[in-house]
């Protein structure tokens, strides 16, 4: 547990603040109440009645109970006097009052002596308060219930509490009660007890002085008695003048319990020892002098005697004797007492007024103190809450840091484990490389031994080969059987062809039958067409549908034709396959015939094969070397590309700087434009102002002229008035003058306002001009900077051009390298083709060797095998030397690459330094020279790279030549092999082939290829490990850079926040201190605009001036004391503030450390998370790619299945289409015939239509005639009616004629409508046909 986490720290801060506040107000209240105590001492001279003995007994009983319950806490001890006062105030009304004698008023000299003594004791008390904080809490809390006396807490009790820490709580309770009794003691006791307290301090501090005699104890008892009687309590209330009897009763009620407490305390042994120690050195003479000065009444004397009787029985006789002789003296004392009472009453009246004022001041000060206490409590509460919150945050942050540390340790352990694992892998790889070299040597030796053993075996296996040759003859027989089977298959294929032809014949027959059926149907349909001639309009619609159907049928026919063509192509393919099978059968026959002759040139073929194998292996080695060389070149290209990327990034940075400069220049242009705009605005304003001023000046001149003219007119009018004194004219003139005066005043006011506006506008113009001048200066500065930047930009552009040229060169080099890589890939393809050809040749040679039946001699073959073994050994040696040379080359290339990387890193650092220097200082000649040197170095490097590339090109050209030579040799070998084949066909051999030797050779070759593959895999693993290491280094550098940048950012943020918080905290403390001082000293006024130090100095000077003005008054001293205390409080507060600041600084440092550690770990975790995300993304991409491939394969399978189904479906549809085709052909023919018939019918109908049109014309003419006749008949009827000659027969005939004519007209109209409808239908039909 640290200091800030302990409970002691939580409790200590608020307790210290509370004690300081209470001490301050306690001391302040004590000093302000000193004058009130002097006034109250004068009131104590009044007669105070005492209580009866019964009441004393009851009080003693109550006191015993209180002593038993005295072991209370500090809060209980505070509540005791309040309850006590309330009970006494309620009990006063029912009790009988007995007068008690009062002390005589002290003289002014005694008051001065008392003040001096109190001033001496004040520093002693303050030292006690600062040393004993626990003891000082008790009196600070007991001051609150407004005590009258100014007596401080006795130091003897504090010393006793220090000496006796093991006492019980009852002792503490009794000590608290003693303190309450002493607060109510009279000022006479104060004067006597002050020196006693000093002496008791010395006794308690040293522990040397002790009580020795019983006489001193008796004297101490005598001292306590009058002091108890003298103690009084006078409350500070406004109603003191109205009822003094109640005041006296309250005083008595408060005195009596104190007296009883004093009597009971003297009875206790422990309390007696303390009082003996306090009053040990009091002189008896001083006690007698104090008694002589005091005047007692009879009742008071009796009370004193009763108390003395209770104390000691020996003194009673002496008191009785002295009382008899002093009766006369008492009479004189009574007379003097009456006089004193009169004086005291006057003083009391004065003091009551003073008390009222003091009470008012006390109330105001109490209110202020309560407000201050409330604020301080609120402040303490807020501080405690903030402290708790801060502590919780600290705990949380501490836990988080612990968790992060645990995580960091885990990560570190993981990294260490990974590093150890990588080291193990590197060791394993090194061991594997060493093991492979050892294994190669051991394998080579083992292979030699195996070859020797195989040589011995070959002799034994020759006998077995003869048996194998017999088996081969059996295989030949089996091949002949296979040929017979193929012939059978051909016969079956011919049968199938015949079946297909029969199927086609059947289909043609069916097609012809279908055609005949269609013809019969066509005849039936012709009959139906003749019967359905009236329904031609309906058939036209069906014809449209049929035409669409015909189009579909045509398309289906085309598809069917294409399918038939595909079937024909398949049939042709089958025929071609049959022909190929026949050709193969013929070849087999020729091979069987030629197998009898081929064994003379076997030895020569073996030699040629051995030489070819050597050459092939050499070419393979050279190709492997070229492949390694190309891999190294690819790595170098990658490094160069990385360099290019870095240079491009630097160029981008420089471009960003140039863009920023361009943006700054653009902003400058904008500023210049805005300045020009403002200048134009200013000019416009100036012109407007000048125009307004000129207008106003002209108006002013006009008004002056008018004023002069008016004055002249006034003078003329005055002359006229003097000549002709008419009152009306005079009044009119006066009115005119007044109106013109008012106009002049308004004009003057307008001029004044115009002048004021002109002045304001001139001020605005001046301000705008100043702003314009400042802006022009800024523009000039910016232009100067821009010029500097332009020079820098020109340099940057030159550098960019150089870099661009270098990039072009690098790109050209990359393109050349890519072209070379493509050439190499093509050459590899050619080499693979050559290998395949060589393998084919080997297979042919093997077949030839198998086909050999005879060999010349076994000894020649053995010699050839030995030669082959020697050649293999030579090849292995050459391979070893080549591998060693390649390893050396790789090591040198690796060193060269490392040197290039170091140079690149140095160049990067140099470029960064140059960029920083360019930002700090605009173009410097030294840096330019350095850049030029760097460029020269890069050019030299480019030249080196070009030379290297040229060397590589030369190597490639030489290798290309070698490959061409090898190809030419292969061609020669092919020609020789063909010649050998021909010779073998001509000559037959009877010797068996050596298959086992060929198998051994092939096994050796396979082993060599496997070793080469292992070497390649090991090289790839080493390169992969190097790449991983380089990637890890780059990631570490990037992480370090990110951490440094984040640390800088966080430090800046923390410093800014800490500065702002400190300033706010200091300002808050200063404001609080100012408010406290203003509340304490409201009369002092200091301007608030000053700084805190100047304000404090001014605040110190103002009270001093007030003190100089009121130097004679006692209030000045009190204020000085208050100022001292305030200064002390201020120092204490400053110390606390400094402590808080130190604590805050420590906490801020801890927080910064925590933040740094947290951010570091966060960055590390972020890096790890990014890596994991990248890996996850890669896995996801691979997974998605695999899923896509799976889906693609599924789709392909589905497509294949669909295609199969479609194929089957199409075959079915073909059959259906063929059937439908036959039907459709017949239908088409029928439709053609129908079309021809319809056309003929249409022609006949057109002729008929023309005839009908002629008939219609005639009918219309006839209708016109009929209508004219009708009209004439109607005219005749009208004539007959007029003539009244109309027989009934003629009328009936005319009616019938009219009816018949109407019927004929309606019929003709219906016919016309029908003809029109037919015409419209035929027109539509023609449109459809067209």
From Swiss-Prot:
Residue intervals on the Cytoplasmic side: 1-6
GO biological process, one term: protein transport
Transmembrane segments: 7-29
Biased composition (Basic and acidic residues): 123-135, 172-182
GO cellular component: endoplasmic reticulum membrane
Glycosylated residues in this chain: 172, 435, 772, 904, 1055, 1236, 1302
UniProt note on tissues of expression: Expressed in male brain, heart, kidney, liver, lung, spleen and testis.
One Gene Ontology molecular-function label: kinesin binding
Comp. bias (Basic residues): 113-122, 161-171
Post-translational modification Phosphothreonine, affected residues: 153
Subcellular location: Endoplasmic reticulum membrane
Stored InterPro entries: Kinectin, Rib_rcpt_KP
Residue span of region Disordered: 49-81, 108-218
Protein's membrane topology: Single-pass type II membrane protein
Coiled coil start-end: 332-1329
All ranges on the Lumenal side of the membrane: 30-1330
Keywords: Coiled coil, Endoplasmic reticulum, Glycoprotein, Membrane, Phosphoprotein, Signal-anchor, Transmembrane, Transmembrane helix
Record's keyword annotation contains Transmembrane helix: yes
Residues the record lists as Phosphoserine modifications: 75, 77, 156, 1085, 1286
Family of this protein: Belongs to the kinectin family.
Primary role: Receptor for kinesin thus involved in kinesin-driven vesicle motility.
Subunit structure: Parallel homodimers formed between the membrane-bound and the cytosolic form, and also between 2 cytosolic forms.
Protein's recorded name: Kinectin
Classification of source organism: Eukaryota, Metazoa, Chordata, Craniata, Vertebrata
Name of the gene encoding the protein in the UniProt record: KTN1
């Amino acid at each position: 547990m640290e200091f800030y986490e302990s409970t002691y720290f939580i409790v200590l801060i608020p307790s210290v603040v509370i004690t300081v506040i209470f001490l301050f107000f306690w001391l302040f209240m004590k000093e302000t109440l000193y004058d009130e105590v002097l006034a109250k001492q004068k009131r104590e001279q009044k007669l105070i009645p005492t209580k009866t003995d019964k009441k004393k007994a009851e009080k003693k009983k109550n006191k015993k109970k209180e002593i038993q319950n005295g072991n209370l806490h500090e809060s209980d001890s505070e509540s005791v006097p309040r309850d006590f006062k309330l009970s006494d105030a309620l009990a006063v009304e029912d009790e009988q009052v007995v007068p008690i004698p009062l002390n005589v008023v002290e003289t002014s000299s005694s008051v001065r002596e008392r003040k001096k003594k109190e001033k001496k004791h004040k520093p002693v008390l303050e030292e006690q308060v600062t040393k004993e904080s626990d003891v000082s809490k008790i009196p600070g809390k007991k001051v609150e219930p407004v005590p009258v006396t100014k007596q401080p807490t006795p130091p003897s009790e504090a010393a006793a509490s220090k000496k006796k820490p093991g006492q019980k709580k009852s002792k503490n309770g009794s000590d608290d009660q003693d303190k309450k009794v002493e607060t109510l003691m009279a000022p006479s006791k104060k004067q006597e007890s002050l020196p006693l307290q000093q002496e008791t301090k010395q006794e308690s501090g040293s522990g040397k002085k002790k009580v020795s005699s019983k006489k001193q104890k008796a004297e101490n008892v005598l001292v306590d008695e009058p002091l108890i009687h003298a103690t009084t309590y006078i409350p500070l209330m406004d109603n003191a003048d109205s009822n003094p009897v109640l005041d006296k009763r309250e005083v008595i009620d408060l005195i009596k319990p104190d007296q009883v407490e004093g009597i009971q305390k003297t009875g206790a042994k422990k309390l007696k020892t303390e009082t003996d120690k306090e009053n040990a050195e009091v002189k008896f003479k001083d006690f007698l002098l104090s008694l002589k000065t005091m005047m007692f009444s009879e009742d008071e004397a009796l009370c004193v005697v009763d108390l003395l009787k209770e104390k000691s029985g020996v003194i009673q006789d002496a008191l009785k004797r002295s009382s008899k002789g002093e009766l006369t003296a008492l009479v004189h004392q009574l007379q003097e007492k009456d006089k004193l009472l009169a004086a005291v009453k006057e003083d009391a009246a004065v003091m009551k007024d003073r008390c009222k004022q003091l009470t008012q001041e006390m109330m105001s000060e109490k209110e202020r103190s309560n407000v201050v206490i409330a604020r301080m409590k609120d402040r303490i509460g807020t501080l405690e809450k903030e402290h708790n919150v801060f502590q919780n945050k600290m705990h949380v942050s501490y836990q988080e840091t612990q968790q992060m540390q645990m995580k960091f340790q885990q990560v570190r352990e993981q990294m260490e484990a990974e590093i150890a694992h990588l080291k193990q892998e590197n060791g394993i790889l090194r061991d594997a490389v060493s093991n492979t070299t050892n294994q190669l040597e051991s394998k080579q030796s083992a292979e030699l031994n195996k070859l020797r053993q195989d040589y011995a075996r070959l002799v034994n296996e020759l006998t077995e080969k003869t048996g194998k040759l017999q088996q081969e003859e059996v295989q030949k027989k089996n091949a002949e059987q296979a040929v017979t089977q193929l012939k059978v298959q051909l016969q079956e294929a011919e049968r199938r062809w015949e079946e297909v032809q029969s199927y086609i014949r059947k289909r043609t027959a069916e097609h012809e039958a279908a055609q005949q059926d269609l013809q019969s149907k066509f005849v039936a349909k012709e009959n139906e067409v003749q019967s359905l001639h009236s329904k031609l309009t309906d058939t036209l619609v069906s014809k449209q549908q049929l035409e669409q159907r015909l189009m579909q049928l045509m398309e289906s026919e085309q598809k069917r034709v294409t399918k038939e063509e595909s079937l024909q192509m398949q049939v042709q393919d089958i025929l071609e396959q049959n022909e190929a099978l026949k050709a193969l059968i013929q070849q087999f026959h020729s091979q069987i015939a030629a197998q009898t002759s081929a064994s003379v040139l076997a030895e020569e073929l073996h030699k040629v094969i051995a030489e070819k194998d050597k050459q092939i292996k050499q070419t393979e080695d050279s190709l492997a070397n070229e492949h390694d060389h190309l891999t190294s070149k690819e790595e170098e290209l990658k490094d160069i590309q990385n360099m290019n990327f870095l240079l491009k990034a630097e160029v981008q940075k420089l471009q960003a700087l140039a863009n920023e400069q361009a943006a700054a220049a653009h902003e400058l242009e904008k500023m210049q434009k805005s300045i020009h705009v403002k200048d134009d605005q200013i000019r416009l304003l100036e012109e407007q102002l000048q125009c307004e001023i000129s207008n106003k000046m002209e108006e002013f001149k006009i008004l002056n002229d008018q004023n002069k003219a008016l004055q002249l007119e006034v003078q003329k009018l005055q002359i006229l008035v003097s000549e002709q004194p008419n009152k009306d004219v005079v009044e009119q003139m006066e009115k005119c003058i007044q109106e013109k005066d008012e106009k002049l005043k308004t004009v003057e006011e307008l001029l004044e306002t115009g002048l004021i506006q002109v002045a304001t506008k001139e001020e605005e113009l001046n301000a705008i001009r100043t702003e314009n001048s400042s802006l022009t200066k800024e523009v000039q500065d910016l232009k100067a900077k821009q010029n500097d930047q332009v020079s820098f930009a020109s340099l940057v552009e030159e550098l960019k051009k150089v870099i661009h040229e270098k990039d072009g060169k690098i790109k050209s080099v990359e393109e050349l390298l890519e072209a070379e890589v493509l050439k190499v890939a093509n050459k590899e393809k050619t080499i693979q083709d050559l290998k395949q050809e060589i393998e084919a040749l080997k297979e042919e040679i093997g077949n030839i060797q198998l086909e050999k039946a005879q060999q010349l001699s076994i000894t020649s073959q053995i010699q050839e095998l030995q030669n082959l073994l020697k050649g293999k050994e030579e090849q292995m040696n050459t391979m070893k030397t080549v591998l060693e040379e390649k390893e050396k080359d790789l090591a040198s290339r690796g060193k060269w690459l490392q040197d290039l990387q170091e140079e690149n890193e140095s160049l990067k650092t140099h470029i960064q330094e140059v960029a920083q220097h360019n930002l700090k200082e605009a173009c410097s000649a030294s840096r330019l020279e350095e850049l030029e040197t760097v460029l020269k170095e890069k050019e030299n490097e480019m030249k080196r790279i070009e030379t290297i590339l040229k060397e590589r090109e030369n190597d490639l050209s030489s290798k290309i030549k070698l490959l061409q030579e090898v190809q030419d040799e292969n061609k020669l070998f092919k020609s020789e092999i063909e010649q050998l084949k021909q010779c073998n066909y001509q000559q037959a051999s009877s010797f068996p082939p050596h298959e086992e030797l060929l198998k051994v050779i092939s096994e050796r070759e396979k082993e060599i290829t496997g070793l080469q593959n292992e070497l390649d895999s090991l090289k790839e693993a080493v390169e992969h490990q190097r790449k991983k290491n380089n990637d890890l280094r780059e990631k570490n550098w990037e992480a370090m850079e990110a951490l440094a940048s984040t640390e800088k950012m966080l430090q800046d943020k923390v410093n800014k926040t800490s500065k702002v918080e400190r300033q706010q905290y200091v300002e808050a403390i200063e404001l609080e201190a100012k408010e406290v001082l203003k509340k304490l000293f409201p009369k002092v006024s200091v301007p608030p605009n000053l700084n805190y130090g100047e304000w404090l100095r001014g605040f110190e000077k103002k009270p001093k001036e007030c003190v100089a003005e009121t130097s004679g008054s006692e209030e000045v001293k009190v204020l000085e004391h208050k100022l001292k205390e305030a200064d002390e409080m201020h120092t204490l507060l400053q110390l606390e503030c400094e402590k808080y600041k130190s604590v805050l600084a420590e906490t801020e440092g801890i927080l910064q450390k925590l933040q740094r550690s947290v951010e570091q770990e966060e960055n590390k975790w972020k890096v790890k998370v990014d890596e994991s995300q990248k890996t996850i993304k890669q896995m996801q991409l691979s997974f998605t790619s695999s899923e896509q491939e799976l889906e693609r394969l599924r789709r392909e399978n589905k497509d294949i299945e669909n295609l199969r189904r479609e194929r089957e479906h199409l075959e079915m549809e073909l059959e259906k289409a063929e059937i439908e085709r036959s039907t459709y052909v017949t239908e088409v023919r029928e439709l053609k015939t129908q079309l021809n018939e319809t056309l003929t019918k249409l022609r006949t109908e057109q002729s008929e239509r023309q005839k009908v049109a002629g008939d219609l014309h005639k009918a219309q003419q006839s209708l016109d005639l009929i209508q004219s006749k009708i009209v004439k008949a109607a005219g005749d009827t009208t004539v007959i009616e007029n003539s009244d000659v109309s027989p009934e027969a003629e009328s009936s005939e005319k009616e019938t004629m009219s009816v018949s004519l109407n019927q004929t007209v309606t019929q003709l109209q219906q016919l016309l409508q029908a003809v029109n409808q037919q015409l419209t239908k035929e027109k539509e039909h023609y449109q459809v046909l067209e």
